[in-house]
């Protein structure tokens, strides 16, 4: 289902924990990370599509989250031709998205990346709100920045507010999985029900793979 300009209606999800950290999913068998997202089916509202995609990609149900806010209008990104199927080239241009900001009220162990037979992610983690977007595929970075910026006004204030970076450097936190930077990560060991392990790692690639693989 495309609009007149060739954009597919879509929803994006920024999922927060109690520390204002955001959920990142690692795309299946790839090295890129992203937020949950997916197309709006015919007859669905954006909210209905959001709850469906949330469950399909993270295993969470409506009772596990609280809606904090959403973008006022559609945010668009174009997809390069090399990522578009040949049969729809010339018609399909990209995605137009409504973004939702959710607060997780469930537990980390409620997240299940294999809630369907066709998982989108094979690992996940919590990350700082204003993290550099180096690990996001390039053509999505601008719309991610727009969504994060617009929805940041809904973050808790003042004690847990995630401050917007200033100056010429757009973002200031350690990379998701790039340049060496000592950081403390809170991730889930899926072999232990509802328990969290603090792991010291310089980069995401140095983590024990079994620890970050989703259940």
UniProtKB/Swiss-Prot annotation:
The keyword Plastid does not apply. InterPro entries: Nudix_hydrolase (IPR020476), NUDIX_hydrolase-like_dom_sf (IPR015797), NUDIX_hydrolase_CS (IPR020084), NUDIX_hydrolase_dom (IPR000086), RppH (IPR022927). It is an enzyme of class 3 (hydrolase). Keywords: Hydrolase. It holds the Pfam family NUDIX. PROSITE patterns: NUDIX, NUDIX_BOX. Its cofactor is a divalent metal cation. A motif (Nudix box) lies at residues 38-59. Its EC number is 3.6.1.-. One of its GO terms (molecular function) is pyrophosphatase activity. Accelerates the degradation of transcripts by removing pyrophosphate from the 5'-end of triphosphorylated RNA, leading to a more labile monophosphorylated state that can stimulate subsequent ribonuclease cleavage. PANTHER family: ADP-RIBOSE PYROPHOSPHATASE (PTHR43736), DIHYDRONEOPTERIN TRIPHOSPHATE DIPHOSPHATASE (PTHR43736:SF1). Belongs to the Nudix hydrolase family. RppH subfamily. This is RNA pyrophosphohydrolase.
């Amino acid at each position: 289902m495309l609009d007149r300009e060739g954009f597919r209606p879509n929803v994006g999800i920024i999922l927060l924990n109690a520390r204002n950290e955001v959920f990142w999913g690692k795309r299946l068998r790839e090295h890129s990370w992203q937020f949950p997202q997916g197309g709006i089916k015919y007859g669905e509202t954006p909210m209905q599509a959001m709850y469906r995609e949330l469950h399909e990609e993270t295993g969470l149900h409506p009772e596990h989250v609280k809606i904090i806010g959403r973008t006022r209008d559609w945010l668009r990104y174009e997809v390069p031709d090399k990522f578009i199927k040949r049969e729809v080239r010339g018609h399909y241009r990209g995605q137009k998205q409504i973004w939702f900001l959710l607060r997780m009220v469930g537990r980390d162990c409620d997240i299940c990346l294999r809630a369907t037979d066709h998982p989108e992610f094979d690992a996940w983690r919590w990350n700082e709100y204003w993290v550099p977007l180096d690990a996001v595929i390039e053509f999505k970075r601008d719309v991610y920045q727009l969504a994060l910026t617009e929805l940041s006004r809904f973050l808790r204030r003042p004690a847990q507010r995630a401050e917007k970076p200033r100056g010429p450097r757009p973002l200031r936190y350690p990379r998701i999985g790039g340049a060496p930077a000592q950081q403390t990560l809170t991730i889930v060991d899926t072999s232990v029900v509802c328990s969290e392990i603090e792991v010291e790692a310089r980069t995401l690639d140095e983590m024990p793979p079994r620890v970050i693989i989703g259940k």
